[in-house]
Amino acid sequence: MFQLVVDDEIVLVLAEERHAQLMTELIKRNQSRLARWEPWAEQPATISSTRAYIRAALEDFLRGCQISTIIALDGGGRFIGRCGLRINPHAGSGDIGYWIDAEYEGRGITRRAAHALVTAAFSELDLKRVDLRTSVENKRSRGLAERLGFSFKGTHARGLRFANRTDDLALYTVTAQEWTAKQP
């Protein structure tokens, strides 16, 4: 299946059902932190819910609508987060999302993983645009979007719906042409 070697430390591995146990443990370790930014993380992680997510993501992968990867170290042996791309093949665009275990935050791993996936979106999938959507309050994610070269396009009032609240959504975008021009 799909695997993307980012560098000598990081590999993005397509999430498969055999990864459900490890993914569930990783989500549980980070649940309270993730639930602040991700509506899906408000529900307790279970192996069955993780398996269901992986099955749906694999079906979407086969249809060309999603690439859901695990950020892994040690040649794929240690799972530390997730980086994915939802694809709209008709529009030629994608939506990137990511999260990482708190223990690995601040080391540039998420930036490198996201950079590799956006590069693949343009060079391998021939997408024309990649969007990044996050809470306006999520300063780390917004900072990452800007470091990657995405442009802030505006906010969607109450665009992120949680069980007991809504957050305004910040939208960032980069086109294939902009991405190529910004690469060394």
Task: Pin down the residues of each PLM region.
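Acyl-donor (CoA/ACP) binding surface of acyl/acetyltransferases
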Residues: 1-22, 26-33, 68-184
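Generic recognition of well-ordered alpha-helical segments
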Residues: 52-56, 116-119
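A short hydrophobic/aromatic micro-motif that marks alpha-helical segments and, especially, helix-coil
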Residues: 45-46, 61, 164, 179
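Short, polar/charged, Gly/Pro-enriched helix-capping and turn/loop motifs at alpha-helix termini
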Residues: 37, 41, 64-68, 128
